[in-house]
Amino acid sequence: MTQAATRPTAEIGNEDILAVARRQVLEGGQGLSRDQVLQVLRLPDDRLDDLLALAHEVRMRWCGPEVEVEGIISLKTGGCPEDCHFCSQSGLFASPVRSARLDIPSLVEAAKQTAKSGATEFCIVAAVRGPDERLLAQVAAGIEAVRNEVEINIACSLGMLTAEQVEQLAEMGVHRYNHNLETARSFFPNVVTTHTWEERWDTLSMVRDAGMEVCCGGILGMGETLEQRAEFAAELAELGPDEVPLNFLNPRPGTPFGDLEVMPATEALKSVAAFRLALPRTMLRFAGGREITLGDLGAKKGILGGINAVIVGNYLTTLGRPAESDLELLDDLQMPLKGLNASL
């Protein structure tokens, strides 16, 4: 059953939405509906601190104090045939990113460094529509090599999959599969035209049926309306993923979204809290774009406003916060790292 299955959808009337959320989400464990999330997103900025405090209470009650740390690595960079308008790895745009592949020894070394940071999850990513036989063989070899030398969970993000490929990855022992819906179904055609939102959903359904954990989130600040952001939260709640990574658009030169403005920090924090109230039991991960959108102070507020997982180090084509900075912040906030056994 997804977190949206039994939630009410009626309007609340004149009752304060945070009072409703305290009763419904914090005390009752039921995520907010689409209409309720929209009310949260429309709250004035002077309610932000109250909103973040409630989202933190919800996270602590339904997820606990632990924070999961993950590192990611690009096995194949650039040259992607898809036209995701935010992505500098598309071969269709005049971006500075060039196609490259990582060798297995470098992959193993990256996994070792990730584990040293305290991370329990190592995600192997490839810029493709979906994996071909050559890439799957390389992934299989990489997973085996990492397993021989590093104690860490292995996740993959390899685009859209066939049923056979899903089974192959499950047999390789992939712990979690990431495939982001990216945005609301109604806004998706403004972001991608070379495949559909439904194709992504189908891959996620097969991943769940195969017994792997589902990781699915998206990018906020791509021009979607608040209504569409609330729609996206409700769609994720219907899917019921184990993890939702929240990215914020970091406009990349040469892409169709390269000239968009960065989301205001207050709007980003409000969105983090709203997604926590829609998904009270889900792992909510700070992902790409938080550095440019929120800065150091915003990162702290986000972790105290519903976030319970982070990506440490760099992202696929952009720089992230140093792992030490995130780990020091978590230590200062007295938030323990999730151990490997708890992640298995």
UniProtKB/Swiss-Prot annotation:
Any idea which positions bind [4Fe-4S] cluster?
C80, C84, C87
Spell out the HAMAP family in the cross-references.
Answer: BioB (MF_01694)
Function in brief: Catalyzes the conversion of dethiobiotin (DTB) to biotin by the insertion of a sulfur atom into dethiobiotin via a radical-based mechanism.
GO molecular function terms noted in the UniProt entry = 2 iron, 2 sulfur cluster binding; 4 iron, 4 sulfur cluster binding; biotin synthase activity; iron ion binding
This entry's Enzyme Commission designation comes to 2.8.1.6
Pathway given in the UniProt record = Cofactor biosynthesis; biotin biosynthesis; biotin from 7,8-diaminononanoate: step 2/2
A GO BP term here is:
biotin biosynthetic process
A Pfam match is BATS
Q: Which gene encodes it?
A: bioB
Subunit structure, interactors included: Homodimer.
Q: Cofactor(s) for this protein? A: [4Fe-4S] cluster; [2Fe-2S] cluster
Q: Where is the Radical SAM core domain?
A: 65-290
State how the cofactor is bound.
Answer: Binds 1 [4Fe-4S] cluster. The cluster is coordinated with 3 cysteines and an exchangeable S-adenosyl-L-methionine.
Protein family per UniProt? Belongs to the radical SAM superfamily. Biotin synthase family.
Know the name of this protein? Answer: Biotin synthase
Residues that bind [2Fe-2S] cluster: C123, C156, C215, R285
Q: Which reaction does it catalyse?
A: (4R,5S)-dethiobiotin + (sulfur carrier)-SH + 2 reduced [2Fe-2S]-[ferredoxin] + 2 S-adenosyl-L-methionine = (sulfur carrier)-H + biotin + 2 5'-deoxyadenosine + 2 L-methionine + 2 oxidized [2Fe-2S]-[ferredoxin]
Keywords noted in UniProt: 2Fe-2S, 4Fe-4S, Biotin biosynthesis, Iron, Iron-sulfur, Metal-binding, S-adenosyl-L-methionine, Transferase
This protein's record includes keyword Kinase: no
Q: Does the keyword Transmembrane helix apply?
A: no
- Family annotation (NCBIfam families): bioB
